[in-house]
From Swiss-Prot:
It comes from Rhodopseudomonas palustris (strain BisB5). GO terms for biological process: DNA repair; DNA replication. DNA polymerase involved in damage-induced mutagenesis and translesion synthesis (TLS). It is not the major replicative DNA polymerase. Keywords: Cytoplasm, DNA damage, DNA repair, DNA replication, DNA-directed DNA polymerase, Nucleotidyltransferase, Transferase. NCBIfam families: polc, PRK05672.1. Residues 1073-1088, 1097-1110 have a biased composition (Basic and acidic residues). This is Error-prone DNA polymerase. InterPro entries: DNA_pol3_alpha_NTPase_dom (IPR011708), DNA_pol3_finger (IPR040982), DnaE2 (IPR023073), DnaE2/DnaE/PolC (IPR004805), DNAPol_HHH (IPR029460), NA-bd_OB-fold (IPR012340), NA-bd_OB_tRNA (IPR004365), PHP_dom (IPR004013). It is found in: Cytoplasm. It comes from the Bacteria. GO terms for molecular function: 3'-5' exonuclease activity; DNA-directed DNA polymerase activity; nucleic acid binding.
Length: 1110
């Protein structure tokens, strides 16, 4: 007997967040394996996952390709049973998107508030399947069907789902009678929640997370069995053997739906152009106007040909409108004095340069336009433009105003489960205690690894063989990579000529005034929609604020173009010493170590510096050959083809500036084009294959072709193989040369400001936080080391932002602003500008109240300050705790005492204030002086830095007794192999993907910083200490390079954070009998452990957290 075909119309993916237990791609593969006629993906009030299923259908590994039905499960706020809605054609799909947008724009981010009444305006062409719950009232189902059949739709069905609870026969018969009475067909569906029965346990966990309960308390809210998976047609036919029409109806249903995502024909918005001009003509006019502006003396024939070629490709591909859009956005930003700069592959375009979008001069860098746009490649261009991060919102709101929210929205980003979040959610769901889940989660840092191993479980103090722990680890590993929710992209906009909400639903973002679509950048690439990237860059904010400070206090106004990269030798000398804290792109540990080795002397050296410390060049083994050649330790050799197979100098032309070593993506592509005779399109395919080969293994065909072509043209086979291996090492991490050049411009400008105006640079950096590698304490410490005086927060002198004050020696002094006080309410001027333009009320601003009150006369007492500012008592306590009343003659302790005696949040009238003041003076008791060490601790807790000292100063006697040397001693050591001990505050932890598991740690004490290297084996032994310590003790061996780069290679580590709780001015060195080996002393149970004795709330967090990168 022939098995009837079957289409499953009720599939829920994991984009029904915390409900579906399988990826869309999983369903496509399982439906293919089972030979299903079609699958219908219908997630809860969303189309977020459909493009992934659509894209997977193009996978060549699929033996059978089921039809994909695109739909959504409409969940109503008024209690109406769920409805599966499938558009029969393109117009109906647009209506479904708009319906979902209506619901999403009513609610907060992640919500969708729909009522059945909303369907009336959008139901035309939607095939609707009512999905009754397990327990139902026939009258309610009949009423819902009556309401649906009254709509103008593509048809109405009643979903028939077996629940495998022993009553399916009776239940389905009841539903069939309701359907017959309503004159609608019944349709079979397994109402699928996961693609395979093995996913049932994970789906149970997701249900617990969604319901905020545990597996032993969720009860009937869990599915009763593991049957809600995709089933083969034969199994569904067996289940519905009493109603074969329900199976046949699935095929009729699928046949009535013609819509596919192939029908989404994207139309980029038409930009306004002068009368009688096309977009292309207007773009060409702007381009040649830019040429005249940037090159008043004229351009070479080569550059003229380059621009002509680019304009020709833009015309052929129809991208003129896109270039006009980006040009307009950049024009607007500059009209508002917002710094911006294009980067990425767009910097390969001479047209982008003369339009003012990018800063890479085509006469300085050999551009490869095919890296950006190709005649042969049907891919939209992608222009990334960075704007000041504090003012980007002004640009974003301009885009909304210009195009309207129905035509412009931000692209989504899918937030996935990572190891730590997966462990926490699974642990809670399984009923593990918070202590256990925290212990497990704390062994994972960021996105390291794919899950937990047995060693990590043991390090958490848990038994890896405990069945519950083992199950938690197994399920958490399975959950990693699942979508958790949608967020907004960092700045990618989709713009359309028609309504954007007819392509994809639009919803509210968490941030006020922003809306975003449900698809991420990969989704819109698959649909061939174009994206405009409006990105945020903190360094642009810092540079603009620095320029403003220089103009205000030194009378010179600079622009980015005024800072010439070859003018100041002192800047390069500073960088050669590795003095780059705060400098854009070269302040990381690896970059600081590279600077003394590479010794940059010119701008192109900075281009190489930016690019060389990347996983691509490192994994391709390009760094050491380049440095050896640069230092004349190895000859520069350019292989040439044998005989007359080609130009003997072709590789020298390509690799000459990098001494024969390929460092940039463009060089890899040029080698493929010039030496291996790839077409430009094939070269770009090679680049894309290199970016993904570790995941999809598509690079093999390019390897054989490239190596074969090189050998055929007379190149040595060993060279050909090595060349390809080097290029393959780029992976997805190699920089385009144009991108590195864009960033190198900002490297130089920020280095120039640090070198020539360290006062303005420090102040601007502090006012641009959070950004960069280093916390305010290190920024301030570096400025002080460069002869800049930094003054504390004070109510008589500080503003909301940090400011410059009168000169003190060579430089102006930096006054810390109220923004440095943790928890203090102040308003950022840039954000307030956006609020004003949007018609919103100003934000609360305690700092502005202080500044306004100060204009009415000096604060000669705390009581007068409280009366004039009318600040809440909480603000006064924060100021006192930050030691901000020194100018009034009150230190931290005295100020706190005085504040606490003030009435609660009641402004004092004039005479009452005078009386209160007299009473305070009368009753004031002398307070013991607060030790400096306690002040330092309090400074770190309140303003995240201290100008009074470093915590390690006061712990030095204790550590000296343990033969611990200073960080300066480590950094000045030149004896490789020497064993030394060091201790300090952890500033930065890094575990780059290219470092093969090596962790780099930067420690700081009162003398400076020391750099640690922790090899993987040591990391596994001391994972808890490496990841969790704020004050770290380490023993290891010195590793010193000839260039003066020094590391301490760690062998043993100990978390000594508890020592911070015992800080005191008169801390004495321990007696001989109290000396201990840190590794053998479990401080958690030590009877003298100060951490166990001190319970003051201040001791909960003494130091701000380190900055960790991975």
């Amino acid at each position: 007997m022939k098995v009837p075909a079957y289409a499953e119309i009720g599939v829920t993916t994991n984009f029904s967040f915390l409900e579906g237990g399988s990826h869309p791609q999983d369903y496509v593969h399982e439906a293919s394996r089972l030979g299903l006629e079609a699958i219908g993906i219908a997630d809860r009030n969303t189309l977020a996952g459909v493009v992934r299923a659509y894209s997977e259908l193009g996978n060549e590994d699929l033996i059978h390709k089921p039809r994909l039905l695109i739909g959504a499960r409409l969940v109503f706020a008024d209690g109406t049973p769920d409805v599966l809605a499938y558009p029969v054609d393109r117009a109906a799909y647009g209506r479904l998107c708009r319906l979902l947008s209506v619901g999403k724009l009513r609610g907060a981010k992640g919500e969708c508030h729909l009522a059945v009444a909303d369907l009336e305006a959008f139901s035309q062409g939607l095939s609707l399947v009512l999905m009754p719950p397990y327990r139902f009232q026939a009258s309610a189902i009949a009423a819902a069907l009556q309401r649906l059949t009254a709509l103008e739709s593509g048809g109405v069905w009643l979903g028939l789902t077996p629940y495998y609870r022993g009553d399916d026969k009776r239940r389905l018969a009841r539903l069939k009678r309701v359907a017959w009475a309503a004159r609608v067909p019944g349709i079979a569906t397994n109402d699928v929640l996961y693609h395979h029965p093995e996913r049932r346990a994970l789906q149970d966990v997701l249900s617990c997370v969604r319901e905020k309960t545990t597996i032993d308390k969720i009860g009937r809210r869990l599915e009763a069995n593991a049957e809600r998976h995709l089933k083969p047609a034969a199994e569904m036919a067996r289940l519905f053997r009493a109603d074969p029409d329900a199976i046949a109806e699935t095929l009729r249903f699928a046949a009535g739906i013609s819509f596919t995502l192939d029908e989404l024909k994207y139309h980029y918005p038409d930009e306004p152009v002068p009368p009688g001009k096309t977009a292309q003509q207007h773009l060409e006019d702007l381009t040649w106007e830019g040429v005249a502006e940037y090159f008043p003396a004229g351009i070479s024939d080569k550059l003229h040909a380059t621009i002509d070629k680019e304009l020709g490709i833009i015309a052929h591909r129809g991208y003129a409108q896109y270039f006009l859009t980006v040009h307009d956005i950049v024009r607007y930003a500059r009209s508002q004095d917002i710094l911006c700069q294009g980067r990425g592959s767009a910097a390969n375009s001479a047209v982008c340069y003369v339009l003012g979008i990018t800063c890479v001069d085509p006469t300085e860098i050999d551009l490869l336009f095919e890296r950006f746009v190709s005649e042969e490649r049907d891919e939209p261009p992608d222009i990334d433009v960075d704007f000041e991060h504090s003012r980007r919102e002004e640009v974003m709101q301009y885009i909304y105003r210009r195009y309207g929210r129905h035509r412009a929205a931000i692209v989504a980003t899918v937030i996935h489960y990572r190891p730590r979040s997966a462990i926490r959610d699974v642990g809670k769901a399984l009923g593990l205690s918070e202590d256990v889940t925290a212990a497990l989660a704390d062994t994972v840092w960021g996105s390291w690894g794919k899950g937990l191993n047995e060693m990590q479980v043991k390090q958490a103090g848990l038994d890896p063989h405990n069945p519950l722990i083992g199950r938690a680890v197994e399920l958490a590993t399975e959950l990693i990579g699942f979508p958790r929710h949608l967020s907004q992209h960092v700045g990618g906009y989709v713009l359309t000529q028609d309504r954007l909400d007819s392509y994809v639903p639009i919803g509210n973002a968490a941030m006020e005034g922003r809306t975003f679509i449900e698809w991420d950048k990969d989704d819109i690439d698959a649909i061939k929609m174009m994206k405009v990237d409006v990105l945020a860059l903190g360094m642009l904010t810092c540079i603009r604020k620095g320029f403003d400070l220089i103009a205000q206090h030194k009378g010179v106004r600079y622009a980015l173009s005024d800072i010439k990269s070859e003018d100041d030798n002192a800047v390069y000398q500073m960088l050669q010493r590795g003095e780059s804290i705060g400098v854009f792109q070269v302040e990381s540990r690896a970059q600081m170590n590279m600077l003394p080795r590479l010794k940059p002397k010119c701008f192109y050296d900075l281009v190489i510096e930016v690019a060389i410390v990347r996983p691509g060049p490192i994994q391709g083994d390009m760094v050491h050959p380049y440095l050896r050649r640069r230092n004349k330790q190895e000859p520069v050799v350019y292989p040439a083809p044998a005989g007359h197979a080609g130009d003997a100098n072709e590789l020298e032309v390509i690799l000459g500036k990098t001494l024969g070593v390929p460092l940039f993506q463009e060089q890899a592509m040029r080698i493929a084009i010039e030496a291996a005779h790839f077409t430009p399109d094939e070269a770009n395919q090679l680049r894309r294959a290199m970016a993904t080969f570790r995941n999809v293994g598509t690079i093999g065909k390019f390897e054989s072709k490239m190596v074969g072509n090189l050998v055929a043209r007379g190149y040595d086979p060993v060279f050909a193989k090595n060349c390809f291996e080097q290029i393959k090492g780029f992976g997805s991490y190699g920089f385009p040369e144009s991108h590195a050049a864009s960033f190198a411009k900002l490297v130089y400008v920020s280095a120039w400001m640090k070198c020539e105006h360290p006062d303005a640079f420090c102040c601007a950096l502090l006012n641009s936080q959070p950004m960069g590698f280093y916390a305010p304490a290190q920024i301030v410490g570096d400025a002080r080391a460069n002869e800049v005086e930094v003054r504390p927060v004070d109510v008589s002198f500080s503003d909301g932002q940090c400011t410059l004050e009168e000169r003190c020696g060579k430089h102006h002094a930096v006054r810390l602003g109220f923004r440095q006080i943790d928890g203090f309410v102040w308003a950022d001027p840039d954000e307030e500008r956006v609020r004003r333009e949007a018609g919103l009320l100003p934000s609360e601003d305690w700092a502005a109240r202080i500044v306004a009150a100060r204009a009415r006369g000096p604060f000669n007492s705390l009581e007068r300050f409280a009366r004039l500012t009318a600040l809440p008592k909480r603000a006064l306590i924060l100021l006192a705790d930050a030691d901000a009343f020194r100018s009034l003659g009150l230190d931290r302790r005295a100020a706190l005492w005085a504040v606490r005696r003030l009435p609660d949040d009641v402004p004092l009238p004039l005479f009452e204030a005078a009386s209160a003041s007299e009473q305070l003076d009368e009753n004031a008791a002398p307070l013991p002086q607060m030790p400096t060490a306690e002040h330092v601790v309090a400074d770190y807790q309140t303003v995240r830095l201290s100008l009074k000292g470093h915590p390690m100063e006061f712990l030095r006697p204790l550590f000296a007794a343990e033969r611990v040397v200073t960080c300066r001693s480590i950094s000045e050591s030149r004896v490789s192999g020497q064993r030394m001990r060091c201790a300090g505050v952890v500033l930065v932890r890094q575990r780059p993907g290219s470092a093969k598991g090596v962790v780099f740690i930067t420690l700081e004490d009162e003398t400076g910083i020391a750099n640690l290297v922790v090899w993987p084996a040591v990391m596994e032994t001391f994972r808890k200490e490496v990841m969790g310590a704020r004050l770290l003790w380490v023993e290891g061996r010195i590793q010193a390079s000839p260039e003066g780069v020094v590391h301490l290679v760690a062998e043993r580590l100990s978390d000594r954070s508890f020592e911070m709780t015992r800080l005191s001015d008169n801390l004495a060195a321990p007696r001989l009998g109290e000396l201990h080996e840190p590794l053998n002393d479990d401080r958690r149970e030590h009877p003298d452990n100060p951490a166990q004795r001190i319970r003051h709330p201040r001791d909960v967090r003494i130091l701000p957290p380190s900055r960790d990168f991975h």
